[in-house]
């Protein structure tokens, strides 16, 4: 147990020494004497402190700008009679002197005050420092280490106000263990702990999940005469709910409900409701909310917000709004967190405009968005690929004095990576530093993953090396991104080297990383190496499922190595892993590839006998095999048998059947299957469109299906507009969505250089009120590659006049093309059109960002930015 194993309060000192090693340069065991000029400066400052509003005195600011801790302590010594002035000056000089700004230097100044015997001043300063450090765990640990040094070197001890403030701050920082250690030292120093302090300790332990320790501590305080109250009961509820131990939480709540002295209040109910929501017990949570009214305890804003978030997390946005509408009539005013939860829920559901509407209502109600609110909106825009409005929000934040945090920049960097601009995201890293923020592991993982996805491995590695500058260690996700990228490039050896580096750093790899490497090794044909890695990872207990084995099976399947596949099935059993549906499906695929349809049916029966019932995929693979061998009637029978066994066909099954019918000259049956597919709610896909196009070409040209090898070329190169229009008409009659079909056709036509026909197709669809953003991107890319920027401008104008907005990618392609052609004026006009069409109001603020995004991505430029980031971080304030 936590409380039993604590033997000495020196554990704080040991922890402090481990994290923050002592610096002999700051030793104050012997205080240096001041020079005559320093003495004069100290007296000058001390005299200025007697004037009114001395904090605003420009002469004083100039005097202290480079004042070191020794001179500052002398000033405080000269003012020792006025405790308030001493504390105010201490905090003020630490903000304005470059030699007293750092937490270590503040602690140095505190040591000098204690060494001068100014204990009363020191105690008051300590209370102020504790409050200042109450938001930063690292600074609090440094301060506690300083307290231990003061005790050891000078025999200085904290007084009761210091201890009480320290307990509260440790509880706020979720440092329950240190709160208890502090309590033990407090007792050892002879202080009688009050009820407020006991509550604080119980709360701190519970917030950290030390509920058993909290219960033991509570038993102790009950024995000495204190009573169980609502505060302590609520703390226990919090501890159990945070640990998702709802059984014990409900027991505590039951006890509280029966005792008058600790009756649950609104906070108690809200905590328990939150706990129930966290484990998915929403009905009980809502029942508890209804019970509150019966017990005379009205739901608070926090109660409603918790329930609204739970509904949003389940995608029940409409119900969340119904609950929101219930708040004001019940006397509960929504706060910034309530609105933020709704905005976040809408953004995750892809309803960005509705989220914006909620934000506008929020401001109208005089509730101003927080940084978390803005982050939710920025995340929504970035996930939708709309980086321009996301950057406008950044400028709005800055204008409204809502300082962006690390999460803000992480969202924006991820957004840039999503639209294929990881280099611009690296530039944003520098902007983050300029804002006084330091990147975290998420920042680096986003950037490295983005660079790896685009194949920029040298820059990714340079960024990996720069993590040390911020004392950030790469984690499993960092290395997995790099390993995955090298594997995709066919560089399995390099990927293996990074795995070795990862292990040497003591980073535990997970199943995803292991499977990624095995997949990469398999793709370069190194089966033995893949097996060796697999067996090693199984022995390390990293691989607990057959996913990695399935990867090897898949490689063998594609090579039609059936014997090796069956041997691998035996190895799965030998390693103690249970074959999954995927394992058997891969075996079926291998047998079909080798032409052994009978064998694939045997595997299907084996699955049923082993209790691993086949799903739609093994059936579909066999159906596909039968169709490929011209046995369409047998495929139909298997499809019927599959449905009789309770397995419904999916879009892949329908796709296979459509292709099979077309290849066997049965276009009518293919169209019937498409109709059935649409009626069951499945969307048509590119493979369906390709098969239908092939069928129409065969029918129109009168080509026999024995000439199938030429059909693909004909479908791509010789499809005439009449055939395309007929295909669109038929798909529409069958109930299919023509958007997907048109995007498919545009892609194919542009690949064959028939961009003008693609343009005509998109314009025809646009006249019917349908805008195909992806199709337009493809057309823009095709035109820009041929430097036909006027065509692009005409299409952009037409789309805007139709009430739609082209994508950021389309604008970007044309603007960059115009710049390369030297047409800066038209490029600038298009940038302004981009801002206007995206509803950007603050054009001047966001213009700098957008123009930067429109510039080309240069590798060298990006490397220079990384070097500059390293240099910026390494600049430190002068130390004394």
From Swiss-Prot:
Keyword Repeat: yes
Domain of life of the native organism: Eukaryota
Localization per record: Mitochondrion
Family membership noted in the UniProt record: Belongs to the PPR family. P subfamily.
Name recorded for this polypeptide: Pentatricopeptide repeat-containing protein At3g07290, mitochondrial
Alphabetized UniProt keyword annotations: Mitochondrion, Repeat, Transit peptide
Predominant location: mitochondrion
A Gene Ontology term for the protein's cellular component: mitochondrion
NCBIfam families xref list: PPR
Placement of PPR repeats on the sequence: 159-193, 194-228, 229-259, 265-299, 300-334, 335-369, 370-404, 405-439, 440-474, 475-509, 510-544, 545-579, 580-614, 615-649, 650-684, 685-721, 738-768, 772-806, 807-842
Transit peptide, start-end: 1-89
One Pfam family recorded for the sequence: PPR_2
UniProt KW Transit peptide keyword: yes
């Amino acid at each position: 147990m936590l409380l039993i194993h604590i033997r000495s309060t020196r554990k704080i000192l040991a922890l402090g020494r481990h994290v923050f090693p002592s610096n002999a340069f700051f030793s104050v065991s012997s205080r240096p004497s001041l020079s005559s000029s320093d003495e004069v400066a100290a007296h000058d400052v001390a005299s200025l402190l007697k004037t009114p509003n001395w904090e605003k005195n420009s002469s004083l600011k100039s005097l202290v700008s480079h004042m070191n801790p020794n001179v500052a302590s002398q000033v405080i010594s000269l003012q020792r009679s006025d405790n308030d002035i001493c504390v105010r000056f201490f905090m003020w000089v630490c903000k304005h002197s470059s030699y007293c700004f750092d937490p270590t230097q503040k602690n140095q100044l505190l040591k000098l005050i204690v060494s001068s015997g100014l204990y009363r001043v020191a105690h008051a300063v300590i209370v102020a420092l504790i409050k200042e450090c109450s938001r930063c765990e690292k600074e609090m640990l440094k301060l506690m280490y300083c307290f231990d040094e003061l005790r050891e070197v000078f025999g200085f001890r904290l007084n009761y106000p210091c201890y009480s403030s320290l307990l509260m701050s440790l509880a706020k920082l979720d440092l329950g263990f240190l709160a208890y250690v502090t309590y033990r030292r407090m007792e050892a120093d002879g202080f009688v702990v009050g009820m407020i302090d006991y509550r604080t300790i119980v709360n701190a332990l519970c917030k950290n999940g030390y509920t058993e320790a909290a219960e033991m501590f509570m038993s102790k305080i009950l024995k000495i005469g204190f009573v169980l109250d609502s505060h302590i009961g609520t703390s226990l509820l919090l501890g159990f709910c945070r640990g998702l131990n709802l059984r014990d939480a409900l027991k505590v709540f039951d006890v509280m409900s029966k005792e008058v002295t600790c009756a649950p209040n609104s906070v108690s109910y809200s905590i328990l409701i939150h706990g129930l929501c966290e484990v998915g017990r929403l009905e009980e949570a809502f029942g508890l909310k209804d019970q509150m009214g019966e017990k005379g305890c009205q739901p608070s804003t926090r109660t409603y917000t918790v329930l609204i978030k739970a509904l949003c997390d389940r995608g029940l946005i409409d119900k969340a709004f119904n609950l929101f509408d219930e708040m004001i009539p019940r006397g509960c005013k929504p706060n910034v967190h309530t609105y933020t939860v709704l905005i976040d829920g809408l953004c995750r559901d892809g309803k960005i405009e509705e989220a914006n509407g909620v934000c506008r209502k929020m401001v109208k109600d005089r509730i101003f968005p927080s940084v978390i609110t803005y982050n939710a909106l920025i995340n929504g825009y970035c996930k939708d690929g709309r980086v321009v409005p996301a950057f406008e929000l950044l400028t709005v934040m800055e204008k409204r004095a809502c300082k962006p945090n690390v999460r803000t920049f992480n969202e924006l960097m991820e957004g840039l990576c999503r639209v294929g601009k990881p280099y611009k995201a690296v530039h944003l890293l520098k902007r983050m530093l300029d804002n006084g923020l330091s990147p975290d592991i998420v920042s680096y993982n986003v950037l490295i993953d983005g660079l790896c996805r685009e194949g920029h491995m040298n820059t990714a590695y340079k960024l990996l090396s720069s993590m040390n500058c911020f004392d950030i260690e790469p984690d499993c996700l960092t290395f997995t991104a790099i390993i995955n990228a090298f594997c995709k490039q066919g560089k399995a050896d390099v990927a293996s080297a990074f795995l070795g580096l990862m292990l040497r750093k003591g980073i535990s790899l997970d199943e995803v990383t292991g499977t990624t490497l095995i997949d990469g090794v398999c793709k370069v044909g190194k089966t033995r190496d893949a097996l060796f890695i697999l067996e090693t990872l199984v022995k390390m207990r990293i691989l607990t499922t057959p996913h990695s084995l399935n990867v090897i099976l898949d490689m063998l399947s594609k090579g039609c190595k059936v014997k090796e596949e069956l041997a691998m099935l035996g190895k799965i059993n030998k390693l103690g892993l249970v074959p999954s549906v995927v394992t058997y499906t891969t075996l079926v695929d291998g047998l079909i590839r080798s032409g052994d349809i009978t064998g694939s049916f045997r595997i299907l029966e084996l699955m049923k006998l082993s209790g691993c019932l086949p799903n739609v995929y093994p059936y579909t693979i066999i159906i596909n095999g039968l169709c490929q061998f011209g046995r369409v009637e047998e495929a139909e029978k298997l499809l019927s048998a599959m449905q009789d066994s309770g397995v419904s066909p999916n879009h892949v099954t329908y796709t296979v059947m459509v292709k099979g019918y077309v290849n066997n000259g049965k276009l009518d049956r293919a169209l019937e299957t498409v109709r059935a597919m649409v009626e069951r709610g499945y969307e048509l896909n590119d493979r369906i469109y390709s098969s239908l196009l092939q069928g129409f070409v065969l029918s129109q040209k009168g080509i026999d299906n024995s000439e199938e090898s030429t059909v693909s070329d004909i479908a791509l190169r010789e499809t005439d507009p009449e055939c395309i229009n007929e295909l669109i008409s038929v798909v529409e009659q069958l109930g299919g969505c023509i958007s997907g079909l048109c995007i498919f056709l545009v892609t194919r036509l542009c690949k064959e250089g028939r961009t003008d026909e693609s343009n005509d197709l998109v314009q025809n669809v646009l006249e019917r009120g349908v805008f195909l953003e992806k199709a337009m991107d493809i057309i823009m890319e095709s035109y820009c590659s041929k430097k036909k920027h006027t065509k692009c401008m005409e299409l952009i104008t037409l789309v805007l006049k139709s009430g739609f907005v082209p994508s950021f990618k389309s604008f970007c392609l044309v603007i960059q093309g115009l710049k390369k052609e030297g047409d800066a004026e038209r490029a600038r006009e298009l940038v302004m059109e981009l801002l206007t069409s995206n509803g950007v109001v603050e054009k001047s603020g966001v213009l700098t960002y957008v123009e930067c995004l429109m510039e080309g991505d240069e590798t060298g430029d990006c490397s220079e930015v990384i070097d500059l980031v390293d240099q910026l971080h390494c600049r430190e304030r002068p130390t004394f």
